[in-house]
Amino acid sequence: MPIDYSKWKDIEVSDDEDDTHPNIDTPSLFRWRHQARLERMAEKKMEQEKIDKEKGTTSKKMEELEKKLAAADVTDKSDIQKQIDEVKAQEEAWRKKEAELEEKERLEPWNVDTIGHEAFSTSRINKITEKKPQAPKTDEEDTHAMSTFFETHESLLEKMAVLKNGAKSTELFLAEHPHMASEYTANWLTIEALNAAIDFNEEKMKTMAEQCIIIQYLLELSKSLNAVATNTTVQKQFFKKFEAAEPVYMKHYQDEVKAFEDRLRTRAQTKRDAAMEEAEAEEKAERMKSAPGGIDPQEVFEQLPEEMRKCFEAHDIEALKGVAQKMDEEVFKYHFDRCIASGLWVPGKADDDDDDEEAAPAEEEPTTSS
Protein backbone atom coordinates (compact mmCIF):
# COMPACT_ATOMS: atom_id res chain seq x y z
CA MET A 1 0.00 0.00 0.00
CA PRO A 2 1.57 3.37 -1.07
CA ILE A 3 2.20 5.92 1.67
CA ASP A 4 0.31 9.23 1.46
CA TYR A 5 2.75 12.07 2.08
CA SER A 6 0.25 14.85 1.31
CA LYS A 7 -0.42 15.79 4.91
CA TRP A 8 3.25 16.56 5.45
CA LYS A 9 3.81 18.66 2.30
CA ASP A 10 2.80 21.99 3.90
CA ILE A 11 4.39 21.62 7.33
CA GLU A 12 5.86 24.88 8.58
CA VAL A 13 8.88 23.25 10.16
CA SER A 14 10.81 26.45 10.73
CA ASP A 15 10.18 30.12 10.20
CA ASP A 16 13.77 30.69 9.13
CA GLU A 17 13.06 28.87 5.84
CA ASP A 18 11.14 31.93 4.57
CA ASP A 19 12.92 34.38 2.33
CA THR A 20 13.12 37.91 3.70
CA HIS A 21 14.37 41.20 2.35
CA PRO A 22 18.03 41.91 3.21
CA ASN A 23 17.07 45.12 4.99
CA ILE A 24 14.61 43.40 7.33
CA ASP A 25 15.79 42.20 10.75
CA THR A 26 15.15 38.49 10.23
CA PRO A 27 15.36 37.35 13.92
CA SER A 28 12.91 40.06 14.98
CA LEU A 29 10.51 39.13 12.18
CA PHE A 30 10.60 35.48 13.19
CA ARG A 31 9.92 36.40 16.82
CA TRP A 32 6.93 38.54 15.80
CA ARG A 33 5.54 35.81 13.58
CA HIS A 34 5.98 33.23 16.27
CA GLN A 35 4.33 35.45 18.87
CA ALA A 36 1.37 36.10 16.55
CA ARG A 37 0.96 32.36 15.93
CA LEU A 38 1.00 31.63 19.65
CA GLU A 39 -1.68 34.28 20.21
CA ARG A 40 -3.86 32.72 17.50
CA MET A 41 -3.43 29.31 19.12
CA ALA A 42 -4.41 30.74 22.51
CA GLU A 43 -7.54 32.32 20.98
CA LYS A 44 -8.53 29.01 19.41
CA LYS A 45 -8.02 27.26 22.72
CA MET A 46 -10.23 29.78 24.50
CA GLU A 47 -12.88 29.38 21.82
CA GLN A 48 -12.79 25.59 22.20
CA GLU A 49 -13.11 25.90 25.98
CA LYS A 50 -16.07 28.24 25.54
CA ILE A 51 -17.77 25.76 23.20
CA ASP A 52 -17.19 22.90 25.65
CA LYS A 53 -18.59 24.97 28.51
CA GLU A 54 -21.70 26.02 26.56
CA LYS A 55 -22.30 22.46 25.39
CA GLY A 56 -22.17 21.28 28.99
CA THR A 57 -24.59 24.01 30.07
CA THR A 58 -27.10 23.22 27.32
CA SER A 59 -26.89 19.48 28.03
CA LYS A 60 -27.58 20.08 31.71
CA LYS A 61 -30.44 22.43 30.87
CA MET A 62 -31.88 19.85 28.48
CA GLU A 63 -31.89 17.19 31.20
CA GLU A 64 -33.69 19.53 33.61
CA LEU A 65 -36.33 20.45 31.01
CA GLU A 66 -36.94 16.81 30.11
CA LYS A 67 -37.51 16.02 33.78
CA LYS A 68 -39.92 18.95 34.07
CA LEU A 69 -41.75 17.82 30.94
CA ALA A 70 -42.22 14.34 32.36
CA ALA A 71 -43.66 15.72 35.61
CA ALA A 72 -45.61 18.70 34.19
CA ASP A 73 -49.34 19.04 33.71
CA VAL A 74 -50.87 19.07 30.25
CA THR A 75 -51.22 22.87 30.30
CA ASP A 76 -47.49 23.44 31.00
CA LYS A 77 -46.12 20.89 28.57
CA SER A 78 -46.37 23.14 25.50
CA ASP A 79 -44.27 25.90 27.15
CA ILE A 80 -41.67 23.44 28.32
CA GLN A 81 -41.52 21.86 24.87
CA LYS A 82 -40.80 25.28 23.35
CA GLN A 83 -37.92 25.75 25.77
CA ILE A 84 -36.61 22.32 24.84
CA ASP A 85 -36.70 23.21 21.15
CA GLU A 86 -34.78 26.41 21.84
CA VAL A 87 -32.13 24.54 23.80
CA LYS A 88 -31.84 21.98 21.00
CA ALA A 89 -31.28 24.80 18.53
CA GLN A 90 -28.55 26.25 20.76
CA GLU A 91 -27.00 22.83 21.08
CA GLU A 92 -26.97 22.39 17.32
CA ALA A 93 -25.40 25.82 16.87
CA TRP A 94 -22.57 24.96 19.25
CA ARG A 95 -22.01 21.66 17.43
CA LYS A 96 -21.66 23.53 14.13
CA LYS A 97 -19.16 25.95 15.66
CA GLU A 98 -17.18 23.03 17.04
CA ALA A 99 -17.18 21.32 13.64
CA GLU A 100 -15.98 24.54 11.97
CA LEU A 101 -13.20 24.89 14.51
CA GLU A 102 -12.10 21.29 13.97
CA GLU A 103 -12.11 21.72 10.19
CA LYS A 104 -10.12 24.94 10.48
CA GLU A 105 -7.58 23.22 12.69
CA ARG A 106 -7.35 20.27 10.30
CA LEU A 107 -6.59 22.49 7.30
CA GLU A 108 -4.07 24.66 9.13
CA PRO A 109 -0.43 23.77 8.32
CA TRP A 110 1.67 22.22 11.05
CA ASN A 111 4.39 24.30 12.63
CA VAL A 112 7.10 23.92 15.24
CA ASP A 113 4.53 24.37 18.02
CA THR A 114 1.95 21.85 16.76
CA ILE A 115 3.97 19.17 15.00
CA GLY A 116 4.55 17.31 18.26
CA HIS A 117 2.30 16.44 21.17
CA GLU A 118 2.73 14.86 24.57
CA ALA A 119 2.22 11.11 24.21
CA PHE A 120 2.50 10.41 27.91
CA SER A 121 3.62 12.15 31.06
CA THR A 122 5.52 10.71 33.99
CA SER A 123 6.62 11.95 37.37
CA ARG A 124 9.88 10.86 38.89
CA ILE A 125 10.83 10.71 42.54
CA ASN A 126 14.17 10.20 44.17
CA LYS A 127 15.35 6.68 43.68
CA ILE A 128 14.91 4.46 46.71
CA THR A 129 18.17 3.17 48.04
CA GLU A 130 18.71 -0.29 46.67
CA LYS A 131 19.38 -3.09 49.07
CA LYS A 132 23.02 -4.06 48.90
CA PRO A 133 23.58 -7.80 48.66
CA GLN A 134 24.97 -9.24 51.88
CA ALA A 135 26.77 -12.47 52.51
CA PRO A 136 24.37 -15.01 54.03
CA LYS A 137 24.77 -15.52 57.77
CA THR A 138 25.14 -18.89 59.40
CA ASP A 139 22.45 -19.95 61.88
CA GLU A 140 24.83 -19.24 64.73
CA GLU A 141 25.67 -15.76 63.42
CA ASP A 142 22.01 -14.93 62.84
CA THR A 143 21.03 -16.11 66.31
CA HIS A 144 23.80 -14.01 67.86
CA ALA A 145 22.79 -10.95 65.81
CA MET A 146 19.15 -11.38 66.82
CA SER A 147 20.06 -11.77 70.48
CA THR A 148 22.19 -8.62 70.31
CA PHE A 149 19.32 -6.74 68.65
CA PHE A 150 16.92 -7.84 71.40
CA GLU A 151 19.30 -6.67 74.13
CA THR A 152 20.21 -3.37 72.46
CA HIS A 153 16.65 -2.34 71.64
CA GLU A 154 14.81 -3.95 74.55
CA SER A 155 13.16 -0.71 75.71
CA LEU A 156 11.99 0.23 72.19
CA LEU A 157 10.67 -3.27 71.58
CA GLU A 158 8.67 -3.11 74.79
CA LYS A 159 7.22 0.25 73.73
CA MET A 160 6.27 -1.18 70.37
CA ALA A 161 4.58 -4.14 72.04
CA VAL A 162 1.93 -1.90 73.61
CA LEU A 163 1.17 0.31 70.59
CA LYS A 164 -2.55 0.72 69.99
CA ASN A 165 -4.50 2.01 66.94
CA GLY A 166 -2.81 -0.30 64.46
CA ALA A 167 -0.79 1.12 61.56
CA LYS A 168 -1.20 4.77 62.57
CA SER A 169 0.68 4.28 65.84
CA THR A 170 3.28 2.14 64.05
CA GLU A 171 3.85 4.93 61.52
CA LEU A 172 4.44 7.50 64.27
CA PHE A 173 6.74 5.11 66.13
CA LEU A 174 8.85 4.30 63.05
CA ALA A 175 9.04 7.99 62.13
CA GLU A 176 11.14 8.40 65.29
CA HIS A 177 12.83 4.99 65.16
CA PRO A 178 13.05 3.88 61.48
CA HIS A 179 15.76 1.33 62.31
CA MET A 180 13.14 -0.75 64.15
CA ALA A 181 11.65 -1.90 60.83
CA SER A 182 13.52 -5.18 61.03
CA GLU A 183 12.99 -8.91 60.71
CA TYR A 184 14.29 -9.19 64.27
CA THR A 185 11.52 -6.86 65.47
CA ALA A 186 8.94 -9.15 63.86
CA ASN A 187 10.62 -12.16 65.50
CA TRP A 188 10.57 -10.51 68.95
CA LEU A 189 6.91 -9.56 68.57
CA THR A 190 6.07 -13.13 67.54
CA ILE A 191 7.88 -14.62 70.54
CA GLU A 192 6.30 -12.21 73.02
CA ALA A 193 2.85 -12.58 71.46
CA LEU A 194 3.19 -16.35 71.88
CA ASN A 195 4.21 -15.91 75.53
CA ALA A 196 1.15 -13.71 76.07
CA ALA A 197 -1.05 -16.37 74.46
CA ILE A 198 0.45 -19.05 76.72
CA ASP A 199 -0.43 -16.87 79.73
CA PHE A 200 -4.00 -16.35 78.35
CA ASN A 201 -3.33 -12.60 77.98
CA GLU A 202 -5.56 -12.09 74.92
CA GLU A 203 -5.38 -8.29 74.72
CA LYS A 204 -1.59 -8.18 74.85
CA MET A 205 -1.34 -11.02 72.34
CA LYS A 206 -3.67 -9.28 69.86
CA THR A 207 -1.81 -5.97 70.09
CA MET A 208 1.57 -7.54 69.35
CA ALA A 209 0.13 -9.83 66.66
CA GLU A 210 -1.17 -6.83 64.68
CA GLN A 211 2.12 -4.95 65.07
CA CYS A 212 3.97 -8.03 63.86
CA ILE A 213 1.80 -8.32 60.71
CA ILE A 214 2.30 -4.61 59.92
CA ILE A 215 6.08 -4.98 60.17
CA GLN A 216 5.96 -8.10 57.99
CA TYR A 217 3.91 -6.25 55.35
CA LEU A 218 6.48 -3.44 55.39
CA LEU A 219 9.31 -5.95 55.00
CA GLU A 220 7.52 -7.54 52.02
CA LEU A 221 7.13 -4.16 50.32
CA SER A 222 10.81 -3.32 50.80
CA LYS A 223 11.76 -6.72 49.40
CA SER A 224 9.62 -6.13 46.30
CA LEU A 225 11.36 -2.76 45.81
CA ASN A 226 14.77 -4.34 46.41
CA ALA A 227 15.26 -1.81 49.17
CA VAL A 228 15.85 -1.81 52.91
CA ALA A 229 12.82 -1.51 55.19
CA THR A 230 14.62 1.07 57.35
CA ASN A 231 14.55 3.52 54.43
CA THR A 232 12.20 6.35 55.44
CA THR A 233 10.99 6.80 51.85
CA VAL A 234 9.91 3.16 51.75
CA GLN A 235 8.17 3.52 55.09
CA LYS A 236 6.29 6.66 54.02
CA GLN A 237 5.26 5.00 50.78
CA PHE A 238 4.03 1.92 52.67
CA PHE A 239 1.90 3.81 55.19
CA LYS A 240 0.51 6.07 52.46
CA LYS A 241 -0.66 3.00 50.54
CA PHE A 242 -1.92 1.39 53.72
CA GLU A 243 -4.02 4.43 54.60
CA ALA A 244 -5.51 4.64 51.08
CA ALA A 245 -6.11 0.88 50.75
CA GLU A 246 -9.46 -0.25 49.38
CA PRO A 247 -11.87 -2.14 51.67
CA VAL A 248 -11.12 -5.47 49.99
CA TYR A 249 -7.41 -5.13 50.85
CA MET A 250 -8.16 -4.02 54.41
CA LYS A 251 -10.36 -7.09 54.84
CA HIS A 252 -7.50 -9.26 53.61
CA TYR A 253 -5.21 -7.56 56.15
CA GLN A 254 -7.67 -8.09 59.00
CA ASP A 255 -8.13 -11.74 58.01
CA GLU A 256 -4.35 -12.13 58.06
CA VAL A 257 -4.16 -10.70 61.58
CA LYS A 258 -6.95 -12.99 62.83
CA ALA A 259 -5.34 -16.04 61.21
CA PHE A 260 -2.05 -15.18 62.92
CA GLU A 261 -3.85 -14.83 66.27
CA ASP A 262 -5.43 -18.27 65.78
CA ARG A 263 -2.03 -19.79 65.00
CA LEU A 264 -0.62 -18.23 68.16
CA ARG A 265 -3.47 -19.68 70.26
CA THR A 266 -2.97 -23.14 68.75
CA ARG A 267 0.78 -22.98 69.29
CA ALA A 268 0.26 -21.73 72.86
CA GLN A 269 -1.98 -24.69 73.66
CA THR A 270 0.62 -27.06 72.24
CA LYS A 271 3.31 -25.38 74.34
CA ARG A 272 1.18 -25.62 77.49
CA ASP A 273 0.47 -29.30 76.88
CA ALA A 274 4.15 -30.00 76.24
CA ALA A 275 5.17 -28.12 79.40
CA MET A 276 2.64 -30.07 81.44
CA GLU A 277 3.84 -33.37 80.03
CA GLU A 278 7.43 -32.40 80.73
CA ALA A 279 6.60 -31.42 84.31
CA GLU A 280 4.72 -34.66 84.84
CA ALA A 281 7.62 -36.64 83.40
CA GLU A 282 10.06 -34.88 85.74
CA GLU A 283 7.81 -35.53 88.74
CA LYS A 284 7.47 -39.17 87.75
CA ALA A 285 11.23 -39.53 87.35
CA GLU A 286 11.72 -37.98 90.79
CA ARG A 287 9.18 -40.36 92.35
CA MET A 288 10.77 -43.36 90.67
CA LYS A 289 14.18 -42.21 91.83
CA SER A 290 13.10 -42.35 95.47
CA ALA A 291 11.19 -45.64 95.04
CA PRO A 292 13.04 -48.75 96.33
CA GLY A 293 12.22 -50.80 93.24
CA GLY A 294 12.26 -47.98 90.72
CA ILE A 295 8.49 -48.09 90.14
CA ASP A 296 6.33 -44.95 90.05
CA PRO A 297 4.25 -44.99 93.28
CA GLN A 298 1.50 -42.85 91.76
CA GLU A 299 1.10 -45.26 88.86
CA VAL A 300 1.03 -48.23 91.27
CA PHE A 301 -1.54 -46.52 93.49
CA GLU A 302 -3.83 -45.71 90.54
CA GLN A 303 -3.69 -49.36 89.39
CA LEU A 304 -4.57 -50.86 92.81
CA PRO A 305 -7.91 -52.63 93.20
CA GLU A 306 -10.45 -50.25 94.71
CA GLU A 307 -10.62 -52.02 98.11
CA MET A 308 -6.82 -51.89 98.51
CA ARG A 309 -6.71 -48.25 97.39
CA LYS A 310 -9.23 -47.30 100.08
CA CYS A 311 -7.05 -48.93 102.74
CA PHE A 312 -4.02 -46.90 101.63
CA GLU A 313 -6.03 -43.68 101.47
CA ALA A 314 -7.30 -44.28 105.04
CA HIS A 315 -3.94 -45.61 106.31
CA ASP A 316 -5.97 -48.50 107.74
CA ILE A 317 -3.70 -51.53 108.26
CA GLU A 318 -6.43 -53.65 109.82
CA ALA A 319 -8.68 -53.08 106.83
CA LEU A 320 -5.78 -54.04 104.54
CA LYS A 321 -5.40 -57.31 106.47
CA GLY A 322 -9.08 -57.99 105.91
CA VAL A 323 -8.69 -57.36 102.17
CA ALA A 324 -5.73 -59.76 102.09
CA GLN A 325 -7.88 -62.53 103.57
CA LYS A 326 -10.73 -62.00 101.09
CA MET A 327 -8.79 -61.29 97.87
CA ASP A 328 -7.19 -63.90 95.64
CA GLU A 329 -3.76 -64.57 97.09
CA GLU A 330 -1.84 -64.15 93.81
CA VAL A 331 -3.61 -60.92 92.97
CA PHE A 332 -3.02 -59.46 96.42
CA LYS A 333 0.63 -60.55 96.39
CA TYR A 334 1.21 -58.96 92.95
CA HIS A 335 -0.15 -55.58 94.02
CA PHE A 336 1.39 -55.74 97.49
CA ASP A 337 4.85 -56.46 96.03
CA ARG A 338 4.47 -53.46 93.71
CA CYS A 339 3.49 -51.32 96.69
CA ILE A 340 6.71 -52.31 98.43
CA ALA A 341 8.81 -51.74 95.28
CA SER A 342 7.31 -48.29 94.73
CA GLY A 343 7.57 -47.24 98.37
CA LEU A 344 3.84 -47.13 99.00
CA TRP A 345 4.35 -49.75 101.72
CA VAL A 346 7.36 -49.40 103.99
CA PRO A 347 8.15 -52.83 105.49
CA GLY A 348 9.34 -52.99 109.10
CA LYS A 349 10.51 -55.82 111.34
CA ALA A 350 7.87 -58.54 110.93
CA ASP A 351 7.13 -61.34 113.37
CA ASP A 352 8.57 -64.63 112.19
CA ASP A 353 5.35 -66.46 113.03
CA ASP A 354 3.01 -64.15 111.02
CA ASP A 355 2.26 -64.31 107.29
CA ASP A 356 3.79 -61.63 105.12
CA GLU A 357 0.38 -60.23 104.28
CA GLU A 358 -0.70 -60.06 107.92
CA ALA A 359 2.53 -58.65 109.34
CA ALA A 360 1.99 -55.13 110.56
CA PRO A 361 4.56 -54.13 113.15
CA ALA A 362 4.75 -50.60 114.52
CA GLU A 363 7.56 -49.64 112.12
CA GLU A 364 5.66 -50.40 108.94
CA GLU A 365 2.94 -48.20 107.60
CA PRO A 366 1.10 -47.70 104.32
CA THR A 367 1.75 -44.44 102.51
CA THR A 368 -0.11 -42.77 99.68
CA SER A 369 1.30 -40.85 96.76
CA SER A 370 0.40 -37.23 96.71
Swiss-Prot record:
Biased composition (Acidic residues): 351-370
PTM field: Phosphorylated. Dephosphorylated by pph-5.
Region of interest: Disordered: 1-27, 41-63, 272-296, 345-370
UniProt keyword list: Chaperone, Cytoplasm, Phosphoprotein
InterPro entries per UniProt: Cdc37, Cdc37_C, Cdc37_Hsp90-bd, Cdc37_Hsp90-bd_sf, Cdc37_N_dom
Subcellular localization: Cytoplasm
Name of one Pfam family that matches: CDC37_N
Function statement: Co-chaperone that binds to numerous kinases and promotes their interaction with the Hsp90 complex, resulting in stabilization and promotion of their activity. Inhibits daf-21/Hsp90 ATPase activity.
Family statement drawn from the similarity comment of this UniProt entry: Belongs to the CDC37 family.
Protein name: Probable Hsp90 co-chaperone cdc37
Species whose genome carries this gene: Caenorhabditis elegans
Organism lineage: Eukaryota, Metazoa, Ecdysozoa, Nematoda, Chromadorea
